[in-house]
């Protein structure tokens, strides 16, 4: 029973504090309406005082909530006063237009000052937004207001003969010195050069890798051709020697003729020799060969073959046979 009574007392204290809070809020609202009759300094003080009071009440409320926290499980089975659980926190909002207008009149520019000095533009129509919670619509309204204000300001500045655009030949001194910008330029050039060199090195590595692949493929192709050529030669040898050839060893006649033409005597050497210039040949036939003449009267292979001492002439000359022993003895006597 003692626990239930303590819980009831706590709940009653909480309800009493909430009632005191509502009473203070009503008093602050009544005090804000009476600000119109006060002077300017009193108005400012009245603006500050409710804020301080609300801060104090908020601190007191936080302290009271911290000290008198009651769990929901403890309040079960207790009959509270009517509307005790409907107490909610409410922020105090003050919109004292009279004080704000008085302050504005005090700090605003005088009417006789020129537009060039203050450059203050006030829109003719207020901003009207259907849904103030829509961020896009709100920002669009601010943008339109700014554009219209800038256009109005440009018109007033043109009337006052004030230049509002930069000339085409305007030379603006840079914030950084020339030495600093030269260092920046050198650094940018260095970075660009390093990037270019890295790209070139990467490209060379790729080409080298591709070149190795091509070289290996070429070597494999040469080995395969060499193997095929040796097989063809062996088959041709067996064919010419009269060896037994099976159907598996046969190959096309065109292939054998091609291999025979390939291995003709002197066929490779004639192709590899450089051919004489036809223009040079014509001149040699017309004017003769302009080379050395000191051996022009010496015999060569063709001239020697034309005589009896040539290879053909010597073949016709038969050597005398050696006489027999009886003839040799007879000749000695």
UniProtKB/Swiss-Prot annotation:
The protein's role, per its UniProt record: Required for the processing of the 27S pre-rRNA.
Quaternary structure and interacting proteins, as annotated: Interacts with sad1.
A GO CC annotation given for this chain: preribosome, large subunit precursor
Family the entry assigns: Belongs to the EBP2 family.
Record's keyword terms, sorted: Coiled coil, Nucleus, Phosphoprotein, Ribosome biogenesis
Region annotated Disordered, chain positions: 1-75, 203-227, 261-333
PANTHER family, A to Z: RRNA PROCESSING PROTEIN EBNA1-BINDING PROTEIN-RELATED, RRNA-PROCESSING PROTEIN EBP2-RELATED
Gene: ebp2
GO terms for biological process, alphabetical: ribosomal large subunit biogenesis; rRNA processing
Locations listed in the record: Nucleus, Nucleolus
Ranges of biased composition (kind: Acidic residues): 56-75
Residues the record lists as Phosphoserine modifications: 272
UniProt protein name: Probable rRNA-processing protein ebp2
Bias kind Basic residues: ranges: 312-333
Residue runs in coiled coils: 212-240
Basic and acidic residues: bias regions: 19-29, 218-227
Pfam families: Ebp2
Keyword Nucleotide-binding annotated: no
């Amino acid at each position: 029973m003692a626990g239930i009574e303590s819980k009831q007392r706590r709940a009653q204290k909480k309800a009493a504090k909430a009632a005191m809070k509502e009473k203070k809020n009503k008093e602050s609202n009544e005090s804000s309406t009476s600000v119109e009759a006060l002077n300017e300094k009193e108005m400012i003080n009245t603006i500050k005082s409710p804020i301080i009071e609300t801060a104090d009440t908020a601190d007191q409320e936080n302290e009271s909530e911290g000290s008198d926290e009651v769990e929901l499980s403890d309040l079960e089975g207790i009959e509270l006063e009517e509307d005790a659980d409907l107490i909610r926190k409410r922020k105090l909002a003050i919109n004292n237009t009279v004080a704000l207008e008085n302050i504005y009149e005090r700090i605003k520019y005088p009417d006789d000052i020129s537009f060039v000095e203050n450059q203050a533009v006030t829109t003719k129509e207020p901003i009207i937004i259907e849904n103030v919670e829509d961020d896009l619509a709100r920002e669009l309204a601010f943008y339109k207001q700014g554009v219209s204000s800038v256009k109005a300001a440009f018109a007033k500045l043109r009337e006052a003969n004030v230049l509002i655009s930069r000339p085409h030949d305007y030379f603006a001194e840079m914030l950084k010195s020339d030495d600093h910008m030269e260092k920046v330029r050198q650094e940018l050039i260095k970075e660009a050069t390093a990037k270019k060199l890295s790209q070139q090195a990467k490209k060379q590595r790729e080409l080298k890798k591709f070149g190795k692949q091509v070289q290996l493929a070429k070597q494999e192709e040469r080995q395969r051709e060499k193997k095929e050529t040796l097989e063809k030669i062996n088959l041709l040898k067996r064919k010419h020697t009269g060896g037994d050839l099976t159907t598996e060893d046969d190959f096309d006649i065109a292939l054998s003729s091609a291999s025979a033409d390939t291995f003709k005597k002197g066929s490779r050497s004639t192709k590899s020799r450089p051919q004489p210039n036809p223009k040079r040949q014509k001149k040699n036939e017309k004017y003769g060969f302009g080379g050395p003449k000191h051996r022009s009267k010496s015999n060569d292979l063709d001239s020697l073959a034309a005589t009896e001492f040539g290879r053909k002439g010597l073949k016709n000359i038969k050597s005398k046979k050696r006489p027999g022993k009886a003839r040799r003895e007879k000749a000695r006597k």
